[in-house]
Amino acid sequence: MAPNPRKSHPLLKMINNSLIDLPTPPNISAWWNFGSLLALCLMTQILTGLLLAMHYTADTTLAFSSVAHTCRNVQYGWLIRNMHANGASFFFICIYMHIGRGFYYGSYLHKETWNTGVLLLLTLMATAFVGYVLPWGQMSFWGATVITNMFSAIPYIGQTIVEWAWGGFSVDNPTLTRFFALHFLLPFMIAGLTLIHLTFLHESGSNNPLGIVSNCDKIPFHPYYSLKDILGLALLLLPLTTMALFSPNLLGDPENFTPANPLVTPPHIKPEWYFLFAYAILRSIPNKLGGVLALAASVLVLFLSPLLHKSKQRTMAFRPLSQLLFWTLVANLFILTWIGSQPVEHPFIIIGQLASTTYFTILLILFPITSALENKMLNF
């Protein structure tokens, strides 16, 4: 019998083992769809971004008008831009859901997969930040100024790092040029990290809602999950295109319709919605260095998840106390997101400080204690 090229050809064999004949647990739920949705988001962002880059000019005098030109004069330029801007929001929705699922079902015990995933999140955040600066509107300019300025809180070398990042003594043309270069480069870095992420995942195999080894009853990825993923893709593209066509500026900041002006500060500087939780944590500490450390810790704390797992069971499926804590954490993140969008005044300051304290308390203290308590209750 002739050898099947799908199983013998060096390249096709890799694709086959990753997407077609991949042994997959038979009981994974829709929460496992977000990985493929993230891949779709990345491909969409790279494609729309490439088309936008063809019409964009990375110069402070021309950036704003080049974006306006893309929307007015380029064939479907408005649609490409709206898909790209809102695609970023959906990218973050998917990655937050993906992380939440990993946290709920104990997927972080695949340490290498989890750690590369956290690195992917950090790279995505960096990409989104430098991308937000490119239209060179008011919020782009002041967002870049405020966020890059945080590095000046680092003792001794902080100010030097900031001036090195800016390419001068303020956010100006060199900053915009290098941010464009970085925004073009980082998505390909994300694609590379994704391959590493998948390599580690396929080494250990997927987790499942029960958190138990399912080697004995695994099923091939195609056609079962490939079809299920296509449904997920349709359900993602529907709200994305609806948003891009009907309310493209819903999640944007009105300040960004005004060209950047270093002489006029917007009344309330805030990042895009997907960074607001971290921004609220940053603002909840009245000290600059303390705020920056808390901001970094808000994401880097994810690296500690495997070390803080004290339960004898992997998932939270049969741990009601941990479930309660998990959903409290989710609610807390919504509160932080809301606080980040509010001005720095009473009562928002105290709510932000309480929510920030709760965030770290739940993750670092309450989860391990609750896990140990549940072990005792189950006589483990």
Curated annotation (Swiss-Prot):
Cofactor dependence: heme b
Note: Heme 1 (or BL or b562) is low-potential and absorbs at about 562 nm, and heme 2 (or BH or b566) is high-potential and absorbs at about 566 nm.
Record: residues binding a ubiquinone: 202
Name of the protein in its database record: Cytochrome b
Cofactor binding note of this UniProt entry: Binds 2 heme b groups non-covalently.
GO BP terms: mitochondrial electron transport, ubiquinol to cytochrome c
Record carries keyword Transmembrane: yes
Organism: Oceanodroma furcata
